[in-house]
Amino acid sequence: MRALHVTLTYLILGAVFCFGQNSNRVITTGVPFLMITADARAAGMGELGVATSADNYSQHWNPAKYAFAENEKGVGLSYTPYLSKLVDDIFLGNITFYKKVDDRSSWATSLRYFSLGDIQFNEFIAGTIVDQGMERPSELTLDLSYALKLSNEFSMAVAGRFIYSDLKIAVDADTSSASSLGVDVAAFYQSQPFELSSNMAVFRSGVNISNIGPRLNYDSGAQKSFIPTNMRIGAGIDLFFDDANRLGFYTEFSKLLVPTPVAVYDSNKDFLGYRQPDIDFINGIITSFSDAPGGLGEELSEITTAIGLEYRFQESFSARTGFFNESQDKGSRRYLTMGAGFNLDFIEIDLSYLFSTSRVRNPLENTIRFSLSLNLDQSASQPSSKDSLDNSL
């Protein structure tokens, strides 16, 4: 593994926590790794998933989708290199498990681990470089969710999340690890198959408000950090041309529900910079819809947009593409994604690749992401999408 000098370390941390910033009012939060897409299926479709069909990684996007899962239980395993062009030991790992209790309800759990790699700290003393030791900062979350069908077409879910962030370094006695709790509230709609232009179709929509919880406190003398409370709203439609060919169109909108940074001045009215107001997370959520100094226009610029396409052939091969867009003043993340999936009986292998179209470099640019989905048991009570369509004809 590659050891990094302390000076370079802060550049990496800046990229991890504030990547893409080109405006002083870019919204930043603690534990931003919670917003990194872990599964290659969603990553290949412009990093969306709140209203796509249920899969093993629905825990991150919309746990209410598990109520519509076609398999009785499944496991998801994924590995995402981060800043791979700079270092080789920063990564996001994820494992997810779900199980259907019956045809109406299901539960799921997941573990997400983010490693910032080995970091070498040195200090220049009297013309000599003194070794201050090596650290391996990391963060993790442990989730548990429950989903319930309220009708044949609609479900809701709630998830609880334990968040732990260990970014403390031995050479800084003022810092410590931090922890918090988060809650997700999600809803999902999946229509019965219907006819559309001589083809059968299924419409889906979803909403998920995730990471609702208290702020993180790394230093008792400093301002606390908001966790990335986020709202996703999306919709999509699958068109079934025949028993073998299916094409899905999806779109999604997302907004961080944390305060917009505001200008801060000293007692002499000299400008000091931008900082988020020191308020609790509930007030932060409420004010996040109307606190932008630039008014409605700036509020709308805080909404990101993603569109995605997925083509499936005989449930054995998938091809995907998508586009993600963020305002230039709010981070300037813009990129095209592509991906593919291969279903080998009970194992599905997904791959994705990201092409940045922004002048701001993306930490995942030119990185191949992959994930595995293990479908452990086919449910007898939940028919496949093809069977559902056949039964409706």
Feature-to-residue mapping (PLM):
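Subset of outer-membrane beta-barrel
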Residues: 21-393
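Bacterial Sec-dependent N-terminal signal peptides
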Residues: 1-24, 255, 309
